[in-house]
Amino acid sequence: MKKIKNMISFVDNVLVKFRRVFINILTVLFLMLITLSFFYVMGSLFESDKVETEDQVLYLEPNGVILDKAITRNEPFEEFEIFGNSTNQIELESFLKVIKNAGADDDLKAIYVNVDDLSAYYTSALKIADALYEARENGKEIIAFTSGLGTTGYLMASQATEIILEKDSYESVLPFGFSRVRQYQKDFFENIKVDMNVYAAGDFKSGPEGYTRNDMSETDKLAWLEFVTPVWEKYKSKMEAGRGFESGKIQYVGDNYHLLSAENGGNDNETALAIGLVDKLMSKQELRNYMIEKYGSKEEYERPEGISGREYLSTLKDRHVSNKKKRVQEKNKIAIIHVEGEIVTGNIGFNTAGSRDIVKNINKARDDENVKGIVLRVNSPGGDVYASSMITNALEEFQSTGRPVITSMGDIAASGGVWVTTTSEEIWAEETTLTGSIGVYSIIPDFSPLENWVGMSYDGVSMTKAGDVYDLRRGMSEELNNQFRENTENIYKDFVTKVANNRDMDFSEVLKFAGGRIWRGDTAFELGLVDKLGSLEDAIDSMVTKLELEEYKAFSYNNEIEFEDYLNSLTKDILPVQIQGLLNKISGLNRMFLSEKDRFVVAYCFDCGFRNFE
């Protein structure tokens, strides 16, 4: 008995000491955080607000994702990155503003740009490429340095005066165009004895094909090729113009790269130099010396004196580069409501458009009598039907006050991203916007064959027949199967009806370009799916004209993410890419199968993803 007491006492002492050590460690970490916060705040208070631009080189080294509206963190120390810049967000408008102003700024010696770590969809990338080309045409020297670029990265870098490739890099420059390869799992689910019950409305709604096929359908190939081929032509044209190539060279490089590489001993960097994709090969140290010799002094600087994009942005006062009218009248406000990312219920997060927060923003605009109209900015592949309906309901309530809503489509406004536009008086899209995908589907997995195979079963009693036939644990009943099918078809009809009413078309007319098929913005304009082609700025100007305003202010509500969600995103970002992909799939399945209420149907565009050798 004494030995047992001694053992318990020993364990208790160990636990007490461990607890003390753990608490001490937490205390030290907390004090370090407070100290860092203090020095950061004091540094911010005493640092000079004056940013010198004369005889400077502007260094643009964006690291992150291009989007319309950045997400801020709802936390006390939101300026601190815990695991580094894993969730960097670059607002397109601000980035373009820096490039356009820098191109016309005679004080700046040159622009240095490195887009290796910049991720942008093609409409945004084309805008950035155009801005760089315009700056170069204005006489500004642009030096692009890279350790390796794919198609979209090279599109932007090719607008520079000079492209320098890191000679020791193993990535090189490979503008091979767009490629779309999906994983197909039909046989996999059959082999593990899981029945994937798929209900799709729309012949071109290819999202669930990964569960029902072992290869890409002809309709999927057709829709994607018709969408992306003109985009690829536009990319090639701009790359060739930027580099001074004859027409057809980029296509030739992509089709014959294996031969071109063989001519240069299989060395990708030497191949890029030989065929003119880049101008020079340099190490980073050689680049530093080159920049000092070209733009700097002989002093021991790490690089010539320069300023960052963030510093340069702080010197620019106006929010919009191309203001045609003043936006200073607080009594005439235009609210820009962003729907960015996958549409889900709940709060806004990284790459998710949470309907709860979006509805809150719409209601803020509704309750503010100084807000004269809403410009809905959509950059979304769609998502949950219920969440999309929550957004349109809030917009309709805003419109019931007699104030208008105009939509501006960004890179993507597909499926549920179209659904949320169906109350708008006017819809704008970019030429290369990916839109359409008017269709819905639901996926219900049935694990009963697997459970039976391993020796598991469910049995019990129920007070009603429905209690038995609607219990998925017992397998997919005929009654439940029919209901899911009818539910999907009914939501599809509702979707088409909403579009038809908004576009002032017959139901049958909309069916011709619905069916889940994706369209480019210019084709959508020809079909009548959108009213006009243009940018967010054009949509705002259209709202100003509609309201007959002389002075106004266009503004956006902040998109805040809860600190817990931010920590979750950081934790996921440090995981290997393969694990991240698996978690995304599990998360998607969770939203489909374990969502609130009985919402099994989604309006999402799985077709909106592609690989461009980034």
Task: Label each PLM-derived region with a short phrase.
Residues 241-242, 260-261, 279-330, 441, ...:
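C-terminal long alpha-helix characteristic of the crotonase
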Residues 40-54:
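Aromatic-capped interface at the extracytoplasmic side
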Residues 186-292, 448, 452-527, 531-533, ...:
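Charged, glycine-interspersed solvent-exposed loop segments at helix/strand-loop junctions
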Residues 1-22:
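N-terminal Lys/Arg-rich, disordered targeting/topogenic segments
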Residues 51, 56-182, 324-450:
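Cleft-lining beta-strand/loop regions that shape enzyme active-site pockets
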Residues 12, 419, 519-520:
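Tryptophan-centric aromatic hotspots in well-structured domains and transmembrane helices
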Residues 23-41:
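Hydrophobic membrane-insertion alpha-helices, especially the h-region
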Residues 2, 317-370, 487, 558-614:
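Intrinsic disorder and flexible/low-complexity segments
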